[in-house]
């Protein structure tokens, strides 16, 4: 397997996996991520899990084709169910909405462990995910942004501290500048564009309904300021 099998979104996730990690990929689909990490020597073994037999069958076929059946354990599971005793250190949950990722984390209390790194790639509602992480004492330690198939994506590296904190509604959407890589500036600009379109759509809807638009106004102002920093 080579880099071509991973798009920029999954490469961003892969960049945050620690060398030698006991790794799990939740919602693995084709098992591309664990196979890439094995082939590049980042990890020695992996768990690849999915809730549906179809995607898991695709993963199994790819694992067999790569000759990695001894290195990848395939698991039919709902989220992280049954994985609390596997000694996992790095867990990727990718390609799902932020609310579903929250549900998976809530159902797996064992992830509240300072030795576990979570790699979370929400497809939507990142602000819901960030708010949950803050309320439960999970600190975001790094943010990566990538563009794949014309869409901008966010990936978060997260560690448990046990110390809850407040997250500003704007920061919940746009993230923390200090945690971003300068190499992601182009992708982050595209991410800002997408969030701006969403905010403008909500703003128009609220205005037509005679509702307050304070939240949208604040977000649009913050997006403008972020663009000035990127310029």
How does the language model describe each region?
Residues 1-20, 35, 57-86:
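S-adenosyl-L-methionine
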Residues 2-6, 82, 99-231:
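Class I S-adenosyl-L-methionine
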Residues 20-29:
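Conserved class I S-adenosyl-L-methionine
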Residues 30-43:
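Conserved SAM-binding loop of SAM-dependent methyltransferases across substrates and taxa
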Residues 45-50:
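Conserved SAM-binding motif I beta-strand of class I
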Residues 52-54:
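Conserved SAM/SAH-binding beta-strand->alpha-helix loop
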Residues 88-95:
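Short SAM/SAH-binding signature in class I
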